[in-house]
Amino acid sequence: MLDGYVSFLLKIKKKWNCRKVIHIGDVVDWSILSYHEKNPSMPSAGDEYQKALKQVQQLYRAFPRTTVMTGNHDDLPARQARSSGIPAELLRSNSKIWETPNWDWRPRYASYVYEGVTYVHGDRGKGGLQAALKNAKENFTSWVQGHLHTQGGCSYFANQDSVVFGLSTGCGINYEAASMDYGKRFSAKPVMGCGVVLGGHQAFFEPMPI
């Protein structure tokens, strides 16, 4: 997580007087558990966990009541367990792993509807440019998603009966970390920020100054 990101989120919460907080996922990276090629200079799984736990606790202290859309990286321990034939009954929940008893962790691929707006992590449905708007059109409901680090912004679509929006929330990753080495070859870089939804009818992307 980028230094200063939690402080930025708190400022946005105060600015808009937000009553509800939804973490769109991923909460953590779990680079060491990734199925992709790994950087040999990366810390061990135990070291990565301890470092990530400190960051998660920063978020938890700032936002003690949060709905969390479990992302593909959040789910890596369970995915690795399945690959190894370990049943889900033997695993700890994300709530226990990250010591967040008051967070409402939703299952991977789940959707969460609040004030008529659908929230998902973003690793299902349509992708590509303006993925959030594509999914809003596909489901004809206002749609908020993350997952795609290089997308942040809101677009609207209307037919003769109603208007929907697609909001991409951006992210708060530390793109200079060793775990993000894979992104160095791409021109597009992560868009830092967060999303704000007002009354289920208006949405804004708030970019983080960097």
Model-derived regions: residue spans:
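Short acidic low-complexity segments
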Residues: 96-114
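A generic local structural motif
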Residues: 7-10, 54-56, 105-111, 128-133
